[in-house]
Protein backbone atom coordinates (compact mmCIF):
# COMPACT_ATOMS: atom_id res chain seq x y z
CA UNK A 1 0.00 0.00 0.00
CA UNK A 2 1.42 3.37 -0.96
CA UNK A 3 1.86 6.16 1.56
CA UNK A 4 -0.20 8.44 -0.67
CA UNK A 5 -3.12 5.99 -0.71
CA UNK A 6 -2.90 5.53 3.06
CA UNK A 7 -2.92 9.26 3.65
CA UNK A 8 -5.91 9.78 1.36
CA UNK A 9 -7.73 6.92 3.10
CA UNK A 10 -7.14 8.35 6.58
CA UNK A 11 -8.31 11.79 5.49
CA UNK A 12 -11.39 10.29 3.85
CA UNK A 13 -12.27 8.38 7.02
CA UNK A 14 -12.11 11.63 8.98
CA UNK A 15 -14.20 13.58 6.47
CA UNK A 16 -16.92 10.95 6.37
CA UNK A 17 -16.84 10.46 10.14
CA UNK A 18 -17.62 14.16 10.45
CA UNK A 19 -20.98 13.52 8.76
CA UNK A 20 -21.63 10.34 10.73
CA UNK A 21 -20.44 7.73 8.23
CA UNK A 22 -18.30 4.73 9.19
CA UNK A 23 -16.39 3.96 6.00
CA UNK A 24 -15.33 0.51 7.22
CA UNK A 25 -18.98 -0.41 7.67
CA UNK A 26 -19.72 0.97 4.20
CA UNK A 27 -17.10 -1.35 2.70
CA UNK A 28 -18.52 -4.31 4.62
CA UNK A 29 -21.96 -3.51 3.22
CA UNK A 30 -20.55 -3.17 -0.30
CA UNK A 31 -19.29 -6.73 -0.01
CA UNK A 32 -22.92 -7.82 0.48
CA UNK A 33 -23.94 -6.51 -2.94
CA UNK A 34 -22.86 -8.74 -5.84
CA UNK A 35 -23.29 -7.45 -9.36
CA UNK A 36 -24.29 -9.98 -12.01
CA UNK A 37 -22.20 -9.50 -15.15
CA UNK A 38 -23.79 -10.50 -18.44
CA UNK A 39 -21.88 -12.95 -20.60
CA UNK A 40 -23.26 -11.60 -23.88
CA UNK A 41 -21.11 -8.46 -23.92
CA UNK A 42 -18.21 -10.76 -24.78
CA UNK A 43 -19.52 -11.97 -28.14
CA UNK A 44 -22.23 -9.49 -29.17
CA UNK A 45 -25.08 -11.83 -28.13
CA UNK A 46 -24.04 -14.50 -30.64
CA UNK A 47 -23.99 -17.53 -28.34
CA UNK A 48 -22.78 -21.01 -29.28
CA UNK A 49 -25.96 -22.48 -30.74
CA UNK A 50 -25.54 -20.72 -34.10
CA UNK A 51 -22.79 -18.09 -33.77
CA UNK A 52 -23.09 -16.98 -37.40
CA UNK A 53 -26.86 -16.49 -37.17
CA UNK A 54 -28.59 -13.13 -37.06
CA UNK A 55 -29.43 -11.33 -33.83
CA UNK A 56 -33.21 -10.84 -33.84
CA UNK A 57 -35.90 -9.83 -31.39
CA UNK A 58 -35.75 -6.10 -31.98
CA UNK A 59 -32.33 -5.72 -30.38
CA UNK A 60 -29.06 -4.72 -32.00
CA UNK A 61 -25.34 -4.83 -31.27
CA UNK A 62 -23.41 -2.27 -33.31
CA UNK A 63 -19.71 -2.11 -34.04
CA UNK A 64 -17.02 -4.49 -35.20
CA UNK A 65 -14.16 -4.16 -32.72
CA UNK A 66 -11.73 -7.05 -33.23
CA UNK A 67 -11.25 -9.89 -30.79
CA UNK A 68 -14.73 -11.04 -29.84
CA UNK A 69 -15.01 -14.46 -28.21
CA UNK A 70 -15.79 -17.28 -30.65
CA UNK A 71 -16.36 -20.16 -28.26
CA UNK A 72 -16.86 -20.93 -24.58
CA UNK A 73 -13.16 -21.26 -23.83
CA UNK A 74 -12.42 -17.81 -25.21
CA UNK A 75 -15.45 -16.27 -23.53
CA UNK A 76 -14.50 -17.67 -20.13
CA UNK A 77 -10.91 -16.46 -20.58
CA UNK A 78 -12.16 -12.97 -21.41
CA UNK A 79 -14.45 -13.02 -18.40
CA UNK A 80 -11.60 -14.08 -16.14
CA UNK A 81 -9.56 -11.15 -17.40
CA UNK A 82 -12.41 -8.77 -16.58
CA UNK A 83 -13.11 -10.37 -13.21
CA UNK A 84 -9.53 -9.79 -12.11
CA UNK A 85 -10.02 -6.06 -12.59
CA UNK A 86 -13.30 -5.63 -10.71
CA UNK A 87 -13.31 -5.58 -6.90
CA UNK A 88 -15.83 -7.30 -4.67
CA UNK A 89 -18.50 -9.98 -5.16
CA UNK A 90 -19.71 -10.80 -8.65
CA UNK A 91 -22.04 -13.18 -10.46
CA UNK A 92 -22.40 -14.22 -14.09
CA UNK A 93 -25.59 -14.05 -16.09
CA UNK A 94 -25.97 -16.64 -18.88
CA UNK A 95 -28.41 -16.99 -21.76
CA UNK A 96 -29.57 -20.40 -22.96
CA UNK A 97 -27.70 -20.00 -26.26
CA UNK A 98 -24.42 -20.26 -24.35
CA UNK A 99 -24.86 -24.02 -23.89
CA UNK A 100 -22.06 -26.42 -24.80
CA UNK A 101 -22.73 -29.62 -26.72
CA UNK A 102 -20.98 -31.73 -29.35
CA UNK A 103 -24.26 -32.09 -31.22
CA UNK A 104 -27.07 -29.59 -31.93
CA UNK A 105 -29.60 -29.24 -29.11
CA UNK A 106 -33.11 -27.93 -29.69
CA UNK A 107 -33.96 -25.16 -27.27
CA UNK A 108 -36.84 -27.08 -25.77
CA UNK A 109 -34.38 -29.90 -25.01
CA UNK A 110 -31.65 -28.05 -23.12
CA UNK A 111 -30.54 -29.77 -19.92
CA UNK A 112 -28.27 -29.01 -16.97
CA UNK A 113 -25.57 -31.19 -18.51
CA UNK A 114 -25.19 -28.65 -21.33
CA UNK A 115 -24.04 -26.07 -18.77
CA UNK A 116 -21.85 -28.29 -16.62
CA UNK A 117 -18.66 -26.54 -17.75
CA UNK A 118 -20.10 -23.19 -16.72
CA UNK A 119 -20.94 -24.52 -13.27
CA UNK A 120 -17.47 -25.97 -12.74
CA UNK A 121 -15.95 -22.71 -13.92
CA UNK A 122 -18.21 -20.72 -11.60
CA UNK A 123 -17.15 -22.88 -8.66
CA UNK A 124 -13.49 -22.31 -9.47
CA UNK A 125 -14.05 -18.56 -9.67
CA UNK A 126 -16.39 -18.37 -6.67
CA UNK A 127 -19.28 -16.98 -8.70
CA UNK A 128 -23.01 -17.38 -8.58
CA UNK A 129 -24.83 -17.94 -11.88
CA UNK A 130 -28.06 -16.45 -13.19
CA UNK A 131 -29.95 -17.56 -16.28
CA UNK A 132 -32.26 -16.56 -19.14
CA UNK A 133 -34.23 -18.55 -21.71
CA UNK A 134 -33.36 -17.24 -25.17
CA UNK A 135 -36.63 -16.40 -26.92
CA UNK A 136 -35.09 -14.71 -29.96
CA UNK A 137 -32.62 -15.42 -32.80
CA UNK A 138 -34.46 -18.61 -33.78
CA UNK A 139 -36.60 -19.70 -36.76
CA UNK A 140 -39.63 -20.13 -34.50
CA UNK A 141 -39.40 -16.53 -33.30
CA UNK A 142 -38.94 -15.08 -36.79
CA UNK A 143 -42.52 -13.80 -37.09
CA UNK A 144 -42.24 -11.83 -33.86
CA UNK A 145 -44.08 -14.11 -31.44
CA UNK A 146 -43.00 -16.77 -28.94
CA UNK A 147 -44.93 -17.38 -25.70
CA UNK A 148 -47.91 -15.47 -27.09
CA UNK A 149 -47.78 -17.12 -30.52
CA UNK A 150 -51.22 -17.89 -32.02
CA UNK A 151 -49.96 -21.28 -33.24
CA UNK A 152 -50.31 -23.63 -30.28
CA UNK A 153 -47.42 -25.87 -31.38
CA UNK A 154 -44.98 -22.98 -31.67
CA UNK A 155 -46.23 -21.54 -28.41
CA UNK A 156 -45.67 -24.90 -26.73
CA UNK A 157 -42.12 -25.03 -28.06
CA UNK A 158 -41.33 -21.80 -26.25
CA UNK A 159 -43.17 -22.89 -23.13
CA UNK A 160 -41.06 -26.05 -23.08
CA UNK A 161 -37.90 -24.01 -23.65
CA UNK A 162 -38.69 -21.83 -20.64
CA UNK A 163 -39.56 -24.85 -18.51
CA UNK A 164 -36.28 -26.52 -19.46
CA UNK A 165 -34.47 -23.27 -18.66
CA UNK A 166 -35.97 -23.23 -15.17
CA UNK A 167 -34.51 -26.68 -14.54
CA UNK A 168 -31.10 -25.42 -15.64
CA UNK A 169 -31.48 -22.42 -13.35
CA UNK A 170 -32.40 -24.60 -10.39
CA UNK A 171 -29.36 -26.76 -11.13
CA UNK A 172 -27.18 -23.66 -10.94
CA UNK A 173 -28.57 -22.74 -7.55
CA UNK A 174 -28.30 -26.25 -6.17
CA UNK A 175 -24.70 -26.68 -7.32
CA UNK A 176 -23.45 -23.25 -6.30
CA UNK A 177 -25.35 -22.70 -3.05
CA UNK A 178 -26.83 -19.38 -4.15
CA UNK A 179 -30.16 -18.90 -5.94
CA UNK A 180 -30.13 -18.38 -9.69
CA UNK A 181 -32.42 -15.60 -10.87
CA UNK A 182 -33.97 -16.65 -14.17
CA UNK A 183 -35.42 -13.81 -16.17
CA UNK A 184 -38.01 -14.27 -18.90
CA UNK A 185 -37.99 -11.65 -21.65
CA UNK A 186 -39.77 -12.18 -24.95
CA UNK A 187 -39.72 -9.96 -28.06
CA UNK A 188 -43.40 -10.51 -28.89
CA UNK A 189 -45.08 -7.54 -30.52
CA UNK A 190 -46.25 -5.90 -33.73
CA UNK A 191 -44.77 -3.29 -36.03
CA UNK A 192 -47.98 -1.45 -36.84
CA UNK A 193 -51.47 -0.72 -35.58
CA UNK A 194 -52.77 -3.74 -33.66
CA UNK A 195 -56.48 -4.53 -33.56
CA UNK A 196 -56.55 -7.33 -30.98
CA UNK A 197 -54.26 -6.41 -28.11
CA UNK A 198 -56.02 -8.67 -25.63
CA UNK A 199 -55.70 -12.16 -27.16
CA UNK A 200 -51.88 -12.25 -27.27
CA UNK A 201 -51.74 -11.12 -23.65
CA UNK A 202 -54.24 -13.77 -22.64
CA UNK A 203 -52.09 -16.40 -24.36
CA UNK A 204 -48.97 -15.03 -22.66
CA UNK A 205 -50.66 -15.14 -19.27
CA UNK A 206 -51.63 -18.78 -19.72
CA UNK A 207 -48.22 -19.70 -21.14
CA UNK A 208 -46.38 -18.14 -18.21
CA UNK A 209 -48.60 -19.95 -15.75
CA UNK A 210 -47.65 -23.23 -17.40
CA UNK A 211 -43.97 -22.25 -17.43
CA UNK A 212 -43.84 -21.62 -13.67
CA UNK A 213 -46.10 -24.53 -12.71
CA UNK A 214 -43.19 -26.76 -11.64
CA UNK A 215 -42.12 -25.83 -8.13
CA UNK A 216 -38.48 -25.27 -7.20
CA UNK A 217 -36.77 -24.43 -3.95
CA UNK A 218 -36.42 -20.62 -3.83
CA UNK A 219 -32.99 -21.19 -2.33
CA UNK A 220 -32.04 -22.54 -5.77
CA UNK A 221 -34.22 -20.71 -8.30
CA UNK A 222 -36.09 -17.39 -8.55
CA UNK A 223 -38.42 -16.48 -11.45
CA UNK A 224 -38.39 -12.97 -12.89
CA UNK A 225 -40.36 -11.39 -15.75
CA UNK A 226 -39.30 -8.38 -17.82
CA UNK A 227 -41.29 -5.79 -19.74
CA UNK A 228 -40.30 -3.57 -22.64
CA UNK A 229 -41.80 -0.51 -24.30
CA UNK A 230 -40.87 -1.42 -27.88
CA UNK A 231 -38.25 -3.03 -30.07
CA UNK A 232 -37.12 -2.70 -33.66
CA UNK A 233 -39.97 -4.16 -35.69
CA UNK A 234 -42.32 -4.03 -32.69
CA UNK A 235 -42.80 -0.30 -32.41
CA UNK A 236 -46.59 -0.21 -32.08
CA UNK A 237 -47.43 -3.03 -29.68
CA UNK A 238 -45.51 -5.08 -27.13
CA UNK A 239 -47.37 -7.99 -25.59
CA UNK A 240 -45.27 -8.02 -22.41
CA UNK A 241 -45.82 -4.40 -21.42
CA UNK A 242 -44.96 -2.86 -18.06
CA UNK A 243 -48.58 -3.06 -16.92
CA UNK A 244 -48.83 -6.70 -17.96
CA UNK A 245 -45.75 -7.83 -16.08
CA UNK A 246 -46.37 -5.65 -13.06
CA UNK A 247 -49.75 -7.33 -12.78
CA UNK A 248 -48.27 -10.76 -13.39
CA UNK A 249 -45.46 -10.41 -10.88
CA UNK A 250 -47.84 -9.01 -8.27
CA UNK A 251 -50.49 -11.69 -8.72
CA UNK A 252 -48.04 -14.60 -9.00
CA UNK A 253 -45.45 -13.16 -6.58
CA UNK A 254 -42.55 -13.59 -8.94
CA UNK A 255 -39.67 -11.16 -9.16
CA UNK A 256 -40.11 -8.22 -11.51
CA UNK A 257 -37.27 -7.17 -13.79
CA UNK A 258 -36.80 -3.47 -14.48
CA UNK A 259 -34.47 -2.72 -17.39
CA UNK A 260 -33.15 0.83 -17.58
CA UNK A 261 -33.66 0.91 -21.35
CA UNK A 262 -37.10 -0.65 -21.57
CA UNK A 263 -39.21 2.40 -20.85
CA UNK A 264 -40.01 5.75 -22.44
CA UNK A 265 -36.87 7.91 -22.66
CA UNK A 266 -38.24 10.29 -20.02
CA UNK A 267 -38.87 7.46 -17.54
CA UNK A 268 -36.27 6.15 -15.10
CA UNK A 269 -36.34 2.85 -13.25
CA UNK A 270 -34.92 4.42 -10.09
CA UNK A 271 -38.35 5.97 -9.53
CA UNK A 272 -40.08 2.62 -10.03
CA UNK A 273 -38.14 0.62 -7.44
CA UNK A 274 -39.95 1.84 -4.32
CA UNK A 275 -43.37 1.51 -5.99
CA UNK A 276 -42.76 -2.04 -7.20
CA UNK A 277 -41.31 -3.13 -3.85
CA UNK A 278 -44.70 -2.56 -2.22
CA UNK A 279 -46.21 -5.32 -4.34
CA UNK A 280 -43.58 -7.83 -5.44
CA UNK A 281 -41.23 -9.92 -3.29
CA UNK A 282 -38.09 -9.20 -5.30
CA UNK A 283 -36.74 -7.02 -8.06
CA UNK A 284 -34.18 -7.85 -10.71
CA UNK A 285 -32.49 -4.79 -12.17
CA UNK A 286 -30.93 -4.65 -15.61
CA UNK A 287 -28.73 -1.59 -15.32
CA UNK A 288 -27.98 -0.24 -18.77
CA UNK A 289 -27.62 3.07 -20.58
CA UNK A 290 -30.26 3.87 -23.19
CA UNK A 291 -29.24 6.59 -25.65
CA UNK A 292 -32.50 7.77 -27.27
CA UNK A 293 -33.74 4.17 -27.30
CA UNK A 294 -32.82 0.81 -25.75
CA UNK A 295 -29.32 1.06 -27.22
CA UNK A 296 -27.60 -0.81 -24.36
CA UNK A 297 -24.57 1.44 -24.13
CA UNK A 298 -21.98 0.74 -21.43
CA UNK A 299 -23.09 1.84 -17.96
CA UNK A 300 -21.70 5.18 -16.79
CA UNK A 301 -21.37 6.61 -13.31
CA UNK A 302 -24.16 9.00 -14.21
CA UNK A 303 -27.17 10.40 -12.38
CA UNK A 304 -29.47 7.47 -13.09
CA UNK A 305 -26.94 4.79 -12.17
CA UNK A 306 -26.37 6.67 -8.93
CA UNK A 307 -30.10 7.05 -8.31
CA UNK A 308 -30.62 3.29 -8.79
CA UNK A 309 -27.88 2.50 -6.28
CA UNK A 310 -29.21 5.07 -3.82
CA UNK A 311 -32.69 3.56 -3.91
CA UNK A 312 -31.29 0.13 -3.05
CA UNK A 313 -29.22 1.44 -0.16
CA UNK A 314 -31.61 4.04 1.25
CA UNK A 315 -34.38 1.48 1.60
CA UNK A 316 -32.13 -1.39 2.71
CA UNK A 317 -33.16 -3.61 -0.19
CA UNK A 318 -29.98 -5.69 -0.13
CA UNK A 319 -31.84 -8.99 0.17
CA UNK A 320 -34.72 -8.17 -2.19
CA UNK A 321 -33.02 -6.51 -5.15
CA UNK A 322 -30.75 -8.42 -7.53
CA UNK A 323 -28.41 -6.18 -9.50
CA UNK A 324 -27.62 -7.23 -13.05
CA UNK A 325 -26.08 -5.43 -16.01
CA UNK A 326 -27.32 -5.49 -19.59
CA UNK A 327 -25.33 -3.76 -22.29
CA UNK A 328 -23.48 -4.87 -25.39
CA UNK A 329 -21.19 -2.54 -27.25
CA UNK A 330 -19.23 -4.05 -30.14
CA UNK A 331 -17.48 -0.77 -31.00
CA UNK A 332 -14.96 -0.92 -28.13
CA UNK A 333 -12.81 -3.53 -26.41
CA UNK A 334 -15.35 -5.93 -24.95
CA UNK A 335 -13.33 -6.79 -21.85
CA UNK A 336 -12.95 -3.09 -21.13
CA UNK A 337 -16.71 -2.65 -21.54
CA UNK A 338 -17.34 -5.20 -18.77
CA UNK A 339 -14.78 -3.55 -16.50
CA UNK A 340 -16.02 0.00 -17.06
CA UNK A 341 -19.69 -0.85 -16.57
CA UNK A 342 -19.28 -3.12 -13.57
CA UNK A 343 -16.84 -0.86 -11.76
CA UNK A 344 -19.21 2.05 -12.32
CA UNK A 345 -22.11 0.13 -10.80
CA UNK A 346 -20.00 -0.71 -7.77
CA UNK A 347 -18.81 2.89 -7.46
CA UNK A 348 -22.43 4.04 -7.42
CA UNK A 349 -23.24 1.54 -4.67
CA UNK A 350 -20.28 2.73 -2.61
CA UNK A 351 -21.27 6.37 -2.98
CA UNK A 352 -24.78 5.47 -1.84
CA UNK A 353 -23.37 3.67 1.20
CA UNK A 354 -21.35 6.77 2.10
CA UNK A 355 -24.43 8.99 2.20
CA UNK A 356 -25.73 10.26 5.60
CA UNK A 357 -29.20 9.00 4.75
CA UNK A 358 -30.63 9.21 8.28
CA UNK A 359 -29.70 12.88 8.53
CA UNK A 360 -31.14 13.61 5.11
CA UNK A 361 -34.33 11.76 5.94
CA UNK A 362 -34.75 13.81 9.12
CA UNK A 363 -34.30 17.05 7.20
CA UNK A 364 -36.89 15.91 4.69
CA UNK A 365 -39.36 14.93 7.40
CA UNK A 366 -38.97 18.32 9.08
CA UNK A 367 -39.55 20.16 5.82
CA UNK A 368 -36.04 21.61 5.63
CA UNK A 369 -35.66 21.11 1.92
CA UNK A 370 -32.98 23.79 1.69
CA UNK A 371 -30.63 21.84 3.94
CA UNK A 372 -31.57 18.59 2.20
CA UNK A 373 -30.50 19.94 -1.18
CA UNK A 374 -27.40 21.60 0.22
CA UNK A 375 -26.16 18.43 1.92
CA UNK A 376 -26.95 16.23 -1.06
CA UNK A 377 -24.81 18.48 -3.22
CA UNK A 378 -21.98 18.83 -0.71
CA UNK A 379 -21.92 15.05 -0.40
CA UNK A 380 -20.76 14.81 -4.01
CA UNK A 381 -17.52 16.59 -3.13
CA UNK A 382 -16.52 14.32 -0.26
CA UNK A 383 -13.48 12.08 -0.99
CA UNK A 384 -15.30 8.88 -1.90
CA UNK A 385 -12.58 8.12 -4.49
CA UNK A 386 -10.08 7.45 -1.70
CA UNK A 387 -12.49 4.94 -0.17
CA UNK A 388 -12.96 3.29 -3.56
CA UNK A 389 -9.21 2.99 -4.06
CA UNK A 390 -8.83 1.34 -0.66
CA UNK A 391 -11.62 -1.08 -1.59
CA UNK A 392 -9.78 -1.94 -4.82
CA UNK A 393 -6.52 -2.35 -2.90
CA UNK A 394 -8.08 -4.75 -0.41
CA UNK A 395 -9.51 -6.84 -3.24
CA UNK A 396 -6.18 -6.86 -5.07
CA UNK A 397 -7.56 -5.03 -8.10
CA UNK A 398 -6.12 -1.95 -9.80
CA UNK A 399 -7.05 1.52 -8.61
CA UNK A 400 -7.81 4.33 -11.02
CA UNK A 401 -7.28 3.64 -14.71
CA UNK A 402 -4.37 1.26 -14.10
CA UNK A 403 -6.64 -1.62 -15.09
CA UNK A 404 -6.54 -0.40 -18.69
CA UNK A 405 -2.87 -1.39 -18.98
CA UNK A 406 -3.84 -4.98 -18.20
CA UNK A 407 -6.61 -4.91 -20.80
CA UNK A 408 -4.26 -3.52 -23.44
CA UNK A 409 -1.72 -6.25 -22.73
CA UNK A 410 -4.45 -8.91 -22.97
CA UNK A 411 -5.64 -7.36 -26.22
CA UNK A 412 -2.15 -7.45 -27.70
CA UNK A 413 -1.32 -10.98 -26.55
CA UNK A 414 -4.71 -12.69 -26.91
CA UNK A 415 -7.51 -10.73 -28.57
CA UNK A 416 -5.49 -9.45 -31.53
CA UNK A 417 -4.73 -13.01 -32.59
CA UNK A 418 -8.39 -13.90 -33.10
CA UNK A 419 -9.47 -13.74 -36.72
Swiss-Prot record:
Reaction it catalyzes: L-rhamnopyranose = L-rhamnulose
E.C. number: 5.3.1.14
Associated pathway: Carbohydrate degradation; L-rhamnose degradation; glycerone phosphate from L-rhamnose: step 1/3
Listed GO biological process terms: L-lyxose metabolic process; rhamnose catabolic process
Keyword ATP-binding applies: no
InterPro entries: L-rhamnose_isomerase, Rhamnose_isomerase, Xyl_isomerase-like_sf
Primary location group: cytoplasm
Organism superkingdom: Bacteria
Sorted UniProt keywords: Cytoplasm, Isomerase, Manganese, Metal-binding, Rhamnose metabolism
Cofactor(s) essential for the protein: Mn(2+)
Entry binding sites for Mn(2+): 262, 294, 296
Record text on cofactor binding: Binds 1 Mn(2+) ion per subunit.
Molecular-function GO terms, alphabetical: L-rhamnose isomerase activity; manganese ion binding
GO CC annotation, single: cytoplasm
Subcellular location: Cytoplasm
Family: Belongs to the rhamnose isomerase family.
Binding partners and assembly: Homotetramer.
Function: Catalyzes the interconversion of L-rhamnose and L-rhamnulose.
Protein known as: L-rhamnose isomerase
Organism: Salmonella paratyphi B (strain ATCC BAA-1250 / SPB7)
Gene label: rhaA
